[in-house]
Regions:
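N-terminal, post-signal peptide beta-strand-biased segments of exported outer-membrane/organellar beta-barrel
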Residues: 18-111, 125
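Residues on the lipid-exposed face of transmembrane beta-strands in outer-membrane beta-barrel proteins
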Residues: 85-91, 144-150, 187-193, 257-263, ...
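Long, internal scaffold/assembly segments composed of regular secondary structure
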Residues: 237-387
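Outer-membrane beta-barrel translocator domains and adjoining extracellular loop/strand segments
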Residues: 70-75, 112-118, 170-178, 213-219, ...
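Outer-envelope beta-barrel architecture signal
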Residues: 52-58, 95-101, 155-159, 196-200, ...
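Transmembrane beta-strands of outer-membrane beta-barrel pores
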Residues: 62-68, 105-109, 152, 165-169, ...
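Outer-membrane beta-barrel "beta-signal"
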Residues: 24, 508-520
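Residues that define the transmembrane beta-barrel architecture of outer-membrane proteins
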Residues: 79-85, 138-144, 179-187, 251-257, ...
Length: 520
């Protein structure tokens, strides 16, 4: 039924675009050009959709991928097989509106994963749970984005709004069996004001994320298994049969705002954005038990530039930086049982006895640089060459007694792509190296189960420098189905990461995939 619905969505999108689009068939080179020419591409401000000057176009595909190898962290698992359907489209709706839509459905299975039953085990809320027994996990995710923006109205004003909606399901297939479900939505209204070639934009958003584990079950009740509750770094409490009656909810409310400025003309356009967001995430168990509360503050900067030095060359320069501070207040609570004397019924609640402010702390810093030189011909990009660089710094701390985990790395990648539209062939290659600049682990108690089975083994991965490469080959061919002519494609791709020697052995991680789809 799901596949039938997906095919119906694809056919509808193709039909809409075919009726509105009279230009030549979309191909990979033209697709790259449409996504590269405007600095406002990828903006969180939906009011900027009309600034991107897009024709009606999109793509849809099915994808299968396999990931494996021995270069992985404990909570990631060693192998993953995944099936995906993806489609996105840009459309002009009537005279006054532009729209963007995206639908992404994927399902997969991960093997030999342990020590986490939630979707965010790293650098986030520390109050999660898991089993130390390796198991397979099945997951399904649905990601929807819908954005609409007006043309310029009322002497320079544009208006828009965007909705992001995500559903997730993560199920453990071995005792103790958990099922984590995710509902995440984000609403972002936005406006821009233009005067001459200058554009100023404002956007604000509300993001609600709820992940919950309703129950943890067992099939084999003859043996009790240890289930762990985590509190940050090595601090995890395991109890025999601890999964019995376990339930937990993580509910986050985030408010954010961004201010953007852009300059727009044919030869040069740019967009610069600064943003700030605050999140407040409650953690709730049975009878509203709260092990703690997690807060985040995020500050981000993005600047994108597009410059045409001639009719046949287009330069892209993208800069991005983000700094996140998170901390958790840890609670000590006591169960209070109250009996109604008239009915004999009991009511339950937890009263807070003690609060450890900012007991767990995390800071994240990311900086990214991307430059790409594009050759342009007939509104296509037949060739590009570029360089990407990134810096990442992570710091986790748990207080009283103090434990820390710190790591950082620098990644430099070269890229090159060719689109031969006359024969329908495209290829992309990337070669890079990620250098580990720091990895330290200092634990107050390194003898705990979580330290011995997760943190200490992970340090080999976090401290490893490695080379990585990516290769993509695509073949495109026009196909007519019921009078609708579209460019169909088949794409094969793969990437490989090889580490420096760890204990006299080089670890490897690979991904291979195959996609079949169409441009429209």
């Amino acid at each position: 039924m799901m596949i039938k619905n997906i095919l119906s969505i694809t056919a509808m999108l193709v039909a809409i675009t075919a009726s509105a689009q009279n230009d030549s068939l979309m191909n990979q080179g033209r697709y790259d050009y449409e996504l590269s020419k405007s600095a406002w591409q990828g903006s969180n401000n939906a009011a900027s959709l009309s600034l991107q000057n897009h024709i009606n176009f999109g793509k849809a595909y099915f994808n299968y991928s396999h990931k494996g190898g021995d270069f992985y962290r404990v909570q990631e698992g060693d192998m993953n097989n995944r099936l995906q359907f993806f489609t996105e489209s840009w459309q002009k709706l009537g005279k006054y509106l532009y729209a963007y839509g995206k639908f992404d459905f994927n399902t997969g299975r991960t093997k030999n994963r342990s020590w986490t039953d939630v979707m965010r085990p790293y650098n986030s809320n520390p109050y999660f749970s898991g089993s130390g027994i390796k198991a397979s996990y099945e997951e399904q995710n649905i990601n929807l984005t819908a954005a609409i923006g007006s043309v310029e109205l009322m002497n320079g004003w544009r208006f828009g709004a965007k909705l992001d909606y995500n559903l997730g399901d993560l199920s453990r297939l071995r005792d103790p069996r958990s099922r984590s479900q995710l509902l995440n939505y984000k609403l972002t209204p936005a406006i821009t004001y233009s005067t001459g070639n200058n554009i100023i934009g404002i956007a604000g958003w509300y993001n609600r994320r709820k992940e919950k584990i309703s129950n943890v079950t067992t099939v084999d009740n003859t043996t009790k298994k240890i289930y762990y509750l985590m509190y940050g770094l090595e601090n995890a409490v395991g109890s025999m049969g601890g999964s019995s009656g376990y339930q937990r909810e993580w509910v986050n409310h985030e408010f954010g705002a961004e201010l953007s400025y852009g300059y727009n003309n044919y030869n040069y356009n740019n967009m610069t954005v600064v943003s700030i967001a605050r999140g407040s995430e409650g953690v709730y168990g049975q009878y509203k038990y709260q092990p703690g509360h997690y807060y985040t503050y995020n500050y981000a900067f993005k600047s994108q530039h597009r410059y045409r030095s001639s009719e046949t060359t287009l330069h892209q320069l993208d800069l991005y930086g983000s700094y996140t501070e998170g901390y958790a207040n840890e609670y000590r609570q006591q169960l209070v049982v109250t009996t109604d004397p008239s009915t004999g019924y009991n009511s339950y609640r937890y009263d807070n006895q003690l609060t450890y402010n900012k007991r767990y702390q995390v800071t994240l810093f990311d900086a990214n640089f991307h430059y790409r030189f594009n050759k342009v011909a007939n509104k296509e990009i037949p060739m590009f060459v570029g360089i990407l660089a990134s810096l990442k710094q992570v710091n986790n701390k748990y207080l009283l007694n103090t434990s820390t985990l710190k790591y950082s790395n620098v990644d430099v990648t070269l890229e090159n792509g060719w689109n031969f539209s006359n024969i329908g062939f495209s290829t992309t290659i990337q070669l890079g190296y990620k250098n580990s600049t720091k990895s330290t682990l200092e634990l107050a108690d390194p003898s705990t189960d979580y330290a011995q089975n997760v943190l200490i083994p992970d340090m080999d991965i976090l401290g490893a420098s490695y080379a990585h490469g990516y290769l993509e080959l695509m073949y495109q061919r026009p196909v007519s189905i019921k009078g609708m002519r579209s460019n169909w494609f088949i794409k094969g791709y793969g990437n490989l990461a090889i580490s420096k020697k760890i204990n006299d052995e080089r670890l490897k991680r690979h991904t291979i995939g195959l996609s079949i789809g169409l441009f429209y």
